[in-house]
A protein has these predicted regions:
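Key DNA-contact positions within bacterial/archaeal DNA-binding proteins
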Residues: 39-41, 67
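Pre-recognition alpha-helix immediately N-terminal to the DNA-recognition helix
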Residues: 22, 26, 42-45, 104
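Short, locally clustered residues in the helix-turn-helix/winged-helix DNA-binding domain
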Residues: 17, 45-49, 110
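The alpha-helix within a helix-turn-helix
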Residues: 59
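Residues within helix-turn-helix
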Residues: 55-56, 67, 74, 94
Length: 124
């Protein structure tokens, strides 16, 4: 290769991508026990902080586009995790609210951050 700086392993973006993937994979067993995917967990964390957000606000907050966010929220609604409510003033807006099932998951998920920190620090 003529340009060493173009090697994949020399790219900051690739190293960050790899680290992100490894962290996400570390979450998998804990989230699987709760019946959640990582994107669902992110949505729930945002709603645990502030319930009743617009779909587009959630998308912006989680750095997701609407083509990803809308089906994710629909799937979560079909699984009984959230309810979707059309805006009273603008029917094009959809608000997302936690169900009792999702509120119970918050208690169960409370140990995940400490577990993750322990796993990340011990896997060296």
């Amino acid at each position: 290769m003529a340009y060493d700086q173009l090697k994949l392993q020399n790219q900051l973006c690739f190293r960050l991508y790899t680290a992100s993937r490894l962290i996400t994979q570390t979450y998998f067993p804990m989230l699987e026990k709760l019946g959640l995917t990582y994107p669902q967990y992110l949505v729930l964390m945002a709603l645990w902080e502030e319930d009743g957000q617009k779909v587009m606000e959630l998308a912006h907050r989680l750095y997701l586009d609407s083509n990803t966010m809308t089906p994710l929220v629909k799937r979560m609604a079909s699984e009984g995790l959230v309810t979707r409510v059309k805006g009273k003033l603008d029917a094009r807006e959809t608000y997302v609210y936690l169900t009792d099932k999702a509120k119970e998951l918050e208690r169960q998920a409370a140990s995940i951050p400490a577990c993750m920190l322990g796993k990340v620090l011990s896997d060296r």
